[in-house]
């Protein structure tokens, strides 16, 4: 494996291009990332910048430091809930010839860096996407507009930052679904309706790309916002249903044409996930493999353990990273990634891997009708 600092400029450009394709936003691939200098938006803010945080009513409170602003806003540390998981989309009528059914619940994207931006008076705000797009979780973040507005108001640089609790309450989720599929790959997918018609159109088109014989219905659901921007939203669920009617070695083909397979096996008491991916020219095998491994981690948690509990008003009750059921590193299987030779144009491959691993993980449960299919992970408050 090449050490990033030894890459030639051409090799580094190729690595960053692959990372851009997988993450959806420009990425930095070099030693600085490992040293904590990844280029996140908040890293470049002036040290004397004011700090703005949200109060309990959703208004911005400004202070000389983050601690001052949080104190003024009355911010309370989030906790996890003991409430049971709910499946918000009711299962539609299931015909007698249906082969499989599936219901999913709310899950939290749980991206590493909460939304942040900063802006000087009269300037352009730093992008909250920073060194990555949080797989669609930050596409509509409010922090850049807030930083610009507050910098002009106070005539000083302002950092606008969301807490982890804010990202959970405000950030978009993948829409929960309920649906079924027949052996001939026709089916029905009922999707929690996102807020915009554009999102609904995008979801409908992406689902049709992988499951052309599916009917898609949108239903209103009380809950946090959902969006088509979240990784493989809608089409991954449809692809998983379709894959359940095919041989396990059949590839999952994403709307962009990337293909992937996944298999889960026991090897001396240790779980191993084998992934095969075809996504055009690799550009950088190390970067591509790392994104595929990350996609496998995300998929396994989605199927087995992740959920986000909301109250009757749709407000999330789980407000800490540990409460989301994200698969712990100690519980992560070994992931083997085979990259298929392909001289075609490079395209995103990890989203296809995400869907393929989810399909394999679901198969391993015996096609449990609800996700999360395993016991919910609880590792503290």
Where is each model-derived feature located?
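C-terminal catalytic domains of large/alpha subunits in multi-subunit enzymes
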Residues: 1-15, 19-22, 80-87, 94-97, ...
């Amino acid at each position: 494996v090449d050490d990033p600092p030894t890459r030639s400029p051409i090799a580094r450009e190729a690595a960053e291009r692959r990372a851009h394709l997988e993450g959806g936003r420009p990425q930095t691939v070099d030693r600085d990332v490992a040293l904590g200098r990844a280029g996140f938006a908040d890293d470049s803010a002036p040290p004397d910048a004011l700090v703005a945080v949200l109060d309990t009513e959703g208004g911005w409170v400004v202070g000389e430091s983050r601690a001052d602003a949080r104190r003024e806003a009355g911010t309370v540390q989030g906790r996890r809930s003991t409430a049971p998981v709910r499946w918000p989309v009711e299962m539609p009528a299931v015909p007698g010839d249906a082969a499989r059914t599936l219901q999913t619940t709310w899950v939290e994207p749980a991206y590493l860096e909460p939304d942040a931006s900063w802006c000087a008076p009269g300037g352009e705000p730093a992008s909250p996407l920073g060194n990555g797009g949080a797989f669609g979780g930050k596409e509509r973040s409010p922090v850049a507009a807030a930083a610009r507005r507050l910098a002009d108001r106070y005539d000083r640089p302002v950092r606008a930052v969301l807490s982890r609790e804010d990202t959970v309450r405000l950030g978009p989720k993948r829409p929960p679904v309920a649906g079924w599929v027949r052996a001939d790959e026709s089916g029905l997918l009922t999707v929690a309706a996102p807020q915009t018609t554009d999102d609904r159109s995008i979801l409908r088109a992406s689902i049709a790309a992988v499951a052309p014989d599916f009917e898609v219905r949108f239903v209103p659901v009380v809950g946090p916002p959902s969006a088509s921007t979240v990784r493989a939203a809608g089409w991954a669920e449809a692809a998983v249903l379709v894959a359940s009617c095919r041989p396990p070695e059949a590839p999952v083909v994403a709307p962009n044409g990337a293909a992937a397979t996944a298999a889960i096996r026991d090897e001396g008491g240790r779980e191993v996930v084998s992934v095969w991916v075809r996504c055009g020219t690799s550009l950088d095998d190390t970067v591509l493999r790392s994104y595929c491994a990350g996609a496998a981690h995300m998929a396994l948690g989605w199927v087995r353990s992740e959920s986000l509990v909301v109250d009757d008003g749709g407000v999330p009750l789980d407000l800490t990273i540990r409460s989301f059921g994200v698969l712990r590193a100690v519980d992560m299987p070994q992931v083997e990634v085979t990259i298929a030779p392909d001289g075609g144009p490079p395209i995103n491959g990890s989203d296809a891997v995400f869907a393929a691993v989810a399909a394999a993980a679901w198969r391993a449960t015996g096609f449990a009708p609800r996700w999360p299919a395993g016991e919910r992970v609880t590792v503290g408050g």
